């Protein structure tokens, strides 16, 4: 991998992480079009630290308040039904499914699903599901109305993001819409819920690479990955603000059509042998 290619992948990561179009799918596809080997699950996980840092900076006031009140509720100094403390508990509850599924299906995640036929299929299928959710959802519930049950359902939907092409934000936002939440509420909880999962995955992959030299992929380079991570942070920060404003006045229809079109393009490229199906 050249430095310019790492920079391009960083831009792609930042542009796509928070949109319901799957950042991992775009990293795979763009990497293949540039003639790269598989950057690996490690590259994706570590570069996502940049976009997750963007979430933390963008929502830092909310996050600090949530953590503070959550800690006070644990100490018994404020009731657990305090709005911010409650959100902290909801993020914890929603994170349980991804921890369990990630631990038990790590090999399948890192090997079996890294195939462009799967990516193209999930882009289209989950694009259609997002369209249905956006059309039939009531768009009435606010973030303050989130329940533990719904938080766990969000968490189960987040597990689908372990399959390349589904999209972490796409899966959780779809779940939120189906449960009747507004587009903005669904997106905000999706972003907050992703923080523990992405940080945990990213730092774990980084530890394996630095300490154990595992799972580095064909083209992994720590310096280049660091560059991609920084670029992903800057671009991702800009995208968050734009996305939240956009969905407050628009539907997800444009993202749905984009997913379907991209999936079809990948099928065509695979069918004509322009790019290989396997990511190795």
Swiss-Prot record:
Name of the top EC class for this enzyme: hydrolase
Record's subcellular location: Cell membrane
Main location per the UniProt record: membrane
Keyword check for ATP-binding: no
Transmembrane regions: 1-21, 40-60, 89-109, 116-136, 146-166, 191-211, 227-247, 260-280
Enzyme Commission number: 3.6.1.27
UniProt key word Cell wall biogenesis/degradation: yes
Protein name: Undecaprenyl-diphosphatase
UniProt source species: Renibacterium salmoninarum (strain ATCC 33209 / DSM 20767 / JCM 11484 / NBRC 15589 / NCIMB 2235)
